[in-house]
Design a protein with these regions (language model features):
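Primarily short, surface-exposed interaction patches in extracytoplasmic proteins
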Residues: 57-65, 70-76, 83, 94-96
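A glycine-rich phosphate-binding loop feature that marks nucleotide/adenosyl-phosphate handling sites
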Residues: 97, 140-145, 281-288
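Acidic/histidine-rich catalytic neighborhood
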Residues: 76-129
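Aromatic- and acidic-residue-enriched carbohydrate-binding clefts of CAZyme catalytic domains
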Residues: 3, 9-35, 102-105
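Active-site core of glycosidic bond-cleaving carbohydrate-active enzymes
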Residues: 2-7, 28-32, 38-60, 68, ...
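Short alpha-helical basic/polar micro-motif
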Residues: 71-75, 79, 264, 303
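Non-catalytic C-terminal accessory modules of carbohydrate-active enzymes
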Residues: 227-373
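Extracellular structured ligand-interaction cores
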Residues: 47, 91, 178, 300-302
Length: 373
């Protein structure tokens, strides 16, 4: 499956050459920055980007009805990349793509590299969950493990991500330089420290806190890599003063994705379920009291917690689907008392210790945690 830049409601044509395009963007056709009767603008990543919401919904719910519905699309996107990628030596390379609309012919755009990884991981996990296409998983895993690494460059004495391996190196607007971090989800607090340092450097260099339609990914990306929480909140406060009450940016005629910027950023700061580890208050100023109720994270867990006087005062996790849980001990290496409840009945009480608690959970069960006396 290969999609153009945009798709409209059934009956609305969004890809063919039009009088509007000929009037205002005729030069794009003449310079071959956009296809005549196509409107892909050189990009091969659009269908993979469409998988983002499907992937998020799948990992946060683990409800079989949903992957049954979307799996054919996700598999179709994976099939495109299986055919389109070029294997050179021990790595897969992406040729003739575009990191930004119209940057035709670039090699290994960093967004596509992140999205392809996400697609292959998602389609494989969906196939396991649904019990289908087991003969395809080896190829999907091979692509995941052998696709090119993220291109790098030096800017102002720092190593940062390069937008492509060959072609566009940097862009002064939007946030495609960090979207392999979020929403593609390929870098997080459990990533290699050197990769996290490069990600920090890139956020420092980009500074896209108030971007036309990219802030919605820039803020969560900063959270995912553990950027300074006070800085994030200062910038988020300024951003929120540049929106309508519903989150739509002032003077921005498009970009409904910006509705998510503030709540999504705050949620990720308070509770993060990423890279198979649930963390509470992972990127939140410890001196700021805060609480949250049933934030949904990967694994189909609903998490509630409170931070008071610099310490986690309470933590409760409801398991919808009975998935395995790995919880980063919010009290560091202190011993923790866990109680397991189901239908108002206490099933188990035990003491836990260690940096990360690994456990099996029961569907419909609640797990409460408090530091042991």
């Amino acid at each position: 499956i290969l999609l153009p830049v945009g798709a409209g409601p059934l009956g609305i044509e969004t890809t063919r050459r039009s009088p509007f395009m000929d009037t205002y963007f005729k030069g794009w056709f003449e310079e071959k920055l956009v296809e005549d009767e196509g409107f892909f603008m050189g990009q091969k990543s659009n269908s993979a980007y469409a998988v983002v919401n499907m992937s998020m919904q799948f990992y946060r719910t683990w409800d079989k009805a949903y992957p049954r519905k979307v799996y054919p699309f996700v598999k179709g996107v994976a099939a495109f990349w299986e055919k389109y990628l070029t294997l050179e030596g021990d790595r897969y390379v992406i040729y003739n793509d575009a990191i930004h609309e119209g940057t035709v012919g670039t090699m290994n755009p960093i967004l596509s590299l992140g999205l392809v990884r996400m697609v292959m991981q998602t389609v494989s996990d969906m196939s396991i969950f649904l019990g289908v296409d087991d003969d395809k998983r080896e190829q999907w895993a091979f692509i995941t493990n052998h696709i090119s690494g993220y291109p790098l460059q030096e800017r102002n004495g720092k190593t940062v991500f390069r937008y492509t391996e060959k072609g566009t190196d940097w862009w002064d607007g939007n946030t495609l330089g960090i979207q392999h971090i979020y929403p593609a989800g390929q870098i997080g607090l459990n990533s290699d420290p050197e990769m996290l340092k490069i990600a920090h450097n890139t956020v420092d260099e980009m500074q896209r806190w108030l971007d036309f339609n990219g802030s919605n990914s820039f803020f969560p990306a900063a959270v995912r890599i553990g950027y300074d929480p006070d800085s994030i909140l200062v910038h988020l406060n300024a951003y929120s003063r540049h929106t309508y009450p519903n989150g739509f940016q002032l003077d921005n005629p498009h970009g409904i994705e910006n509705w998510s910027t503030v709540p999504n950023t705050i949620n990720e700061m308070l509770c993060m379920g990423h890279q198979d580890i649930v963390r509470v208050f992972p990127v939140w100023p410890r001196e700021k009291d805060a609480s949250f109720h049933q934030i949904r994270v990967e694994g189909a867990f609903l998490v509630s917690g409170e931070l008071k006087n610099g310490e986690v005062a309470s933590l409760a996790i409801f398991s919808e689907q009975g998935r395995p849980l790995s919880l980063l001990n919010p009290w560091k290496h202190k011993k923790v008392r866990m109680k397991v409840w189901q239908s108002d009945r206490l099933l188990e009480e035990k003491e836990l210790e260690g940096e990360i608690f690994h456990m099996e959970t029961l569907p419909g069960a609640s797990y409460s945690f408090i530091v042991s006396n």
